[in-house]
Amino acid sequence: MFIMRLFSSTSLILLLSFGSLLADQIYISPDKNIQERFQETLILAKPGDEIILAAGIYEFTDGLSLDVDDIKLSGAGHDKTILSFTNQITGAQGLLVTSDNVILKDFAIEDTKGDAIKVKGSNGIYFINIRTEWTGGPKSTNGAYGLYPVESKNVLIDGCIAIGASDAGIYVGQSENIIVRNSRAEYNVAGIEIENSNNADVYNNLTTHNTGGILIFDLPDLPKQGGHTIRVFDNQSIQNDTPNFAPEGNIVGEVPRGTGIIVMASENVEIFNNEIGNNATVNLAVVAGEDSDDPNYQKFPKRIQIHNNQFGPVGFDPDERGALGPILVEIASENIPDIMWDGILPFWQYLLGQPADEKLVIDSNGDATFINLDAFWYVVLPYFHQPETDIDVFSGNISPLPAVQLVFPD
């Protein structure tokens, strides 16, 4: 038995070593045949290969796809290696990745017809120093998403830039074990969006000049629901002032211009040590999701902790878009506060009270102001409506959430 185990272990080591010896470095430079040559390289690559893109502008007319595990695709820098899709005719995105343990590093994708980089069903996807951009500025005809991992695990987005997406610059959906850090999102409808996902850390990012800076959403009618355990910390969500340019019918089309952070229908979210200010409508909002026929959808946010944030000017030019804007302006009038909760609860909780472990906790945010819109009673009994503005009512002990653990690439 010992000999068999030794033989098996030795065979595995030799196999891994042999596999690494077979791995290639494949060098690509731009030329007139780059569409066919690059796609062929992506198809024929072997696990362990590194595809290295030289500096230059690569022009494509069709989308690209990668379905090989353990691949590193790297350029010379997001300002030097540029994959341009300005003349794209076909393809739903610039690059589609459907494999595991893929590193995308040091290049840019510009002006795709649809999403810039979509990743689906990957376990181990690492975006490092990637830029996605629609260079013509904010337009509803821009692609929806810049960086777009969905239905994936172990997602790292580090040092990236996302500009001009008509939905979200950086979007992670229906995924788990996520880190978004050291990145910049600007001139998108949503800068960073974590949707229907769990175990996410969003930190040390700058979201500015978007319609809304950071969105933590849970939506109905999706295979994965119940987004939870998300930390948003050490970010700047400032001066988000771009008018909403989402195509009609998109959920983010409801986001008012000038929103810092929104949490909708998620649970176990901790927001701390952020700088949130110069947002014309609201700095931080916690709201329920919309009614849905989906029996699995839980639309009420739970266990949201907001602490140790620094707030700046707010509400100086509110946008009355969607369901949030008009009611906020009408109730708060000219005194729009830093933190807004719509106050919507399951009906039985209005009668019996909210469980302690589901309550909103707001603590140690300096001179931050607050309003509970108490929107249900505003609609049902408007003449007796009394919004709550005492922030101390929501103070309490903070229960820190655990850090996300990923295995990082070399």
Q: Which sequence ranges carry the predicted segments?
A:
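N-terminal signal peptide c-region/cleavage motif recognized by signal peptidases
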Residues: 18-19
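Extracellular beta-strand/beta-solenoid scaffold signature
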Residues: 35-39, 61, 85-95, 111-118, ...
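Short, T/G/N/S-enriched strand-turn elements that build extracellular solenoid repeat scaffolds
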Residues: 36-44, 59-68, 73, 84, ...
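Sec-dependent signal peptide recognition
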Residues: 3-14
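Right-handed parallel beta-helix/beta-spiral solenoid domain characteristic of secreted/periplasmic
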Residues: 24-36, 50, 70-114, 136
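Acidic, glycine- and Ser/Thr-rich low-complexity intrinsically disordered tracts
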Residues: 299-410
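Right-handed parallel beta-helix
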Residues: 76-79, 100-111, 123-136, 153-166, ...
